[in-house]
């Protein structure tokens, strides 16, 4: 029996950072720092599959903090994510990394919710930062990106933008920072019927 395309109906937001004095080339921050960031984000035992940024309307009001979802996690499962994540080496001049994910929801001409879009933000800083700087920069760039996504599609804003961010001041040789949405529950659209 055929089934249609799959779409998420429950998501969570999370974030994590990691740093290390050890790493393997060519991207030493990917080796130990990335795993540590996944651990802090509580998604270290998933197989991570990143994808782009379109959100079905069924996710509206169904994006929860990660701590509300961990009891449903399955070791070794595939976790589809929208992730802003990057690593850096302090010898390249990066002392801090900030990441963020923003969400916008659009409405049609009748005011009905169409669905949403996400945007990702990553920024490297030559000095240490604090949460106020990380949050303000994330909101500034994500707001611009989210508005672009709406304008590009000629869609009106349905509700307030949502923002999630994270940052790290790197104290070791290598660092990694991530902010992510993870998708847990799914349904299927009606299958296509071609006459």
UniProtKB/Swiss-Prot annotation:
GO terms for molecular function: arginine decarboxylase activity. It comes from the Bacteria. Gene3D superfamilies: Pyruvoyl-Dependent Histidine Decarboxylase, subunit B. The record marks 52-53 as: Cleavage (non-hydrolytic). GO terms for cellular component: cytoplasm. It is found in: Cytoplasm. The keyword Cytoplasm applies. Pfam families: PvlArgDC. It is an enzyme of class 4 (lyase). The modification Pyruvic acid (Ser) is found at residue 53. Its EC number is 4.1.1.19. Keywords: Cytoplasm, Decarboxylase, Lyase, Pyruvate, Virulence. GO terms for biological process: arginine catabolic process. Binds 1 pyruvoyl group covalently per subunit. InterPro entries: Pyr-dep_his/arg-deCO2ase, Pyr-dep_his/arg-deCO2ase_sand, Pyruvoyl-dep_arg_deCO2ase. Its cofactor is pyruvate. It catalyses: L-arginine + H(+) = agmatine + CO2. Part of the AaxABC system, catalyzes the decarboxylation of L-arginine. The arginine uptake by the bacterium in the macrophage may be a virulence factor against the host innate immune response. PANTHER family: PYRUVOYL-DEPENDENT ARGININE DECARBOXYLASE (PTHR40438:SF1). Belongs to the pyruvoyl-dependent arginine decarboxylase family. Trimer of an alpha-beta dimer. This is Pyruvoyl-dependent arginine decarboxylase AaxB. It comes from Chlamydia trachomatis serovar L2 (strain ATCC VR-902B / DSM 19102 / 434/Bu).
